[in-house]
Amino acid sequence: MSNPHSSAVIVLAAGAGTRMKSAKQKTLHSIGGRSLLAHSLHAAAGLSPQRIVAVIGHRREQVRPEVEAVAATVDCEISVAIQEQQNGTGHAVQCAMHELEGFEGTVVVTNGDVPLLRSETLRSLVDAHTAVPTAVTVLTMSLSDPTGYGRIVRNDEGEVTAIVEQKDGDEETLKITEVNSGVFAFDAAILRSSLGKLDSNNAQGELYLTDVLSIARTEGHPVRAYRAHDHRELAGVNDRVQLAQAGKILNQRLVEDAMRNGATIVDPDTTWIDSEVTIGRDVIIHPSTQLLGKTSIADNCVIGPDTTLTNMVIDEDAHVIRTHGFDSRIGAHANIGPFTYIRPGTVVGENGKLGGFVEAKNAQIGRGSKVPHLTYIGDATVGEESNIGASSVFVNYDGVNKHHTTIGSHVRTGSDTMFIAPVTVGDGAYSGAGTVIKEDVPAGALVVSGGKQRNIEGWVEKNRPGTPAADAARQAHAHETKEG
């Protein structure tokens, strides 16, 4: 037998997955912020194997970039084997073994559509396989309804003698509730030898990987099973219903992990957390919150309710309420929301504020600066301790190009100020309400752009006679005359 202390992993991801009814290859559908295939590859990488081989075939032009993207993030080599025609799992492993020429050790075979399988379970399988000399160890599970799964057939001593697929089983065999998960640990030398002896004499007319067990046993090699503790880990995803079910189980796992690590999640059923999100201690997450991508929440933050954060960095003690944010950073002790939209490239400094109905895009807000109400701030830099008045607009687009606005420190702008970029407002400057700033404002200046107010008496009664406004004006004038 081979050296049991080295390992390689084969991940099968060549199938068509027609039940998904999708233009996307099955294993590229996502739960928890990762594709099904990425989950499987990361679980495999957790074994620290010498190599991972992903077997791809159907729509491989879609799948190969995903394999390459995962390979760039893990500490082991991942290569690709092509299965030109999908002729069964045995044929898929034959294709993969060309990438493992000369390898001697344990070969783990798993699938690209089992996103809930943990590295720890794979490690337990390998440990069980290598504890004593074994040709094959199959990872099994017990199901109350085993329909569709290959049944584990044992002899009187409890040894595995065969795996019988659903379509090939007789009535007695189909009563067995212990089933094949599709995950195996093989001795590399015995696997290589047995693959050459497979035939397609079965209901599907394919090469079954499971027949390797019968071949190995016939040749006198031991075949064993290791039963998984949680059958949900081994649930395959074949359609959209199963995709949603797996996503819910994964999210429950991630939410519970966050709570066990010191976060308070007020309503776990309405909180969704992606696999690469990090959450600190004493964070409070209110209902209907989604933390997506590589979002990072530092200690003592309050997030939600009704908040979606994607690839956001939230520093300690920040409060983010009813906000949608993407690819940005919120500083320590900052206050965001409610109803705030944060677009990529925005940085809010320590003690900063983006208030109700504020949209920020590619904006750097300095320490202690506030944008409290009803404002669009795009392509802008704001210094420290400045205040942007309500209903202000940073007019950054001329129809062709985007332009930058620079606001200094300790600036106070009146409500309804328009900043026509490119423009700079110096430190300590003020603007009057309704000002349209088209030119640079010196430090310490007060800028106003409106002319003297004119009141045209009687205009409404003269130009809008018979309207409610004219009637109200006439009554007001009559009241003034009576009191006068």
Curated annotation (Swiss-Prot):
Region (Pyrophosphorylase): which ranges? 1-240
Which InterPro entries is this protein grouped with? Bifunctional_GlmU, GlmU-like, GlmU_C_LbH, Hexapep, MobA-like_NTP_Trfase, Nucleotide-diphossugar_trans, Trimer_LpxA-like_sf
Q: Where does acetyl-CoA bind?
A: A390, N396, Y397, S415, A433
Q: What is the name attached to this protein's record? A: Bifunctional protein GlmU
Instruction: Give the record's cofactor note, including how many are bound.
Output: Binds 1 Mg(2+) ion per subunit.
Annotated binding of UDP-N-acetyl-alpha-D-glucosamine, by residue: 12-15, 26, 83, 88-89, 150, 165, 180, 238, 343, 361, 376, 387
- State the SUPFAM superfamilies in the record: Nucleotide-diphospho-sugar transferases (SSF53448), Trimeric LpxA-like enzymes (SSF51161)
The record's listing under Pfam families reads: Hexapep (PF00132), NTP_transf_3 (PF12804)
> Which annotated residues bind Mg(2+)?
D113, N238
- Major enzyme class: transferase
Give the record's GO CC terms.
Answer: cytoplasm; membrane
Cofactor(s) for this UniProt protein: Mg(2+)
Entry keyword set: Acyltransferase, Cell shape, Cell wall biogenesis/degradation, Cytoplasm, Magnesium, Metal-binding, Multifunctional enzyme, Nucleotidyltransferase, Peptidoglycan synthesis, Repeat, Transferase
> What is the organism of origin for this protein?
Corynebacterium diphtheriae (strain ATCC 700971 / NCTC 13129 / Biotype gravis)
Its biological purpose: Catalyzes the last two sequential reactions in the de novo biosynthetic pathway for UDP-N-acetylglucosamine (UDP-GlcNAc). The C-terminal domain catalyzes the transfer of acetyl group from acetyl coenzyme A to glucosamine-1-phosphate (GlcN-1-P) to produce N-acetylglucosamine-1-phosphate (GlcNAc-1-P), which is converted into UDP-GlcNAc by the transfer of uridine 5-monophosphate (from uridine 5-triphosphate), a reaction catalyzed by the N-terminal domain.
Residues of the region (Disordered) are: 461-484
Listed under subunit, the entry gives: Homotrimer.
Q: Which domain of life is it from?
A: Bacteria
Q: Which GO terms describe its molecular function?
A: glucosamine-1-phosphate N-acetyltransferase activity; magnesium ion binding; UDP-N-acetylglucosamine diphosphorylase activity
| Principal location class | cytoplasm
Listed NCBIfam families: glmU, PRK14352.1
Q: Where in the cell is it found?
A: Cytoplasm
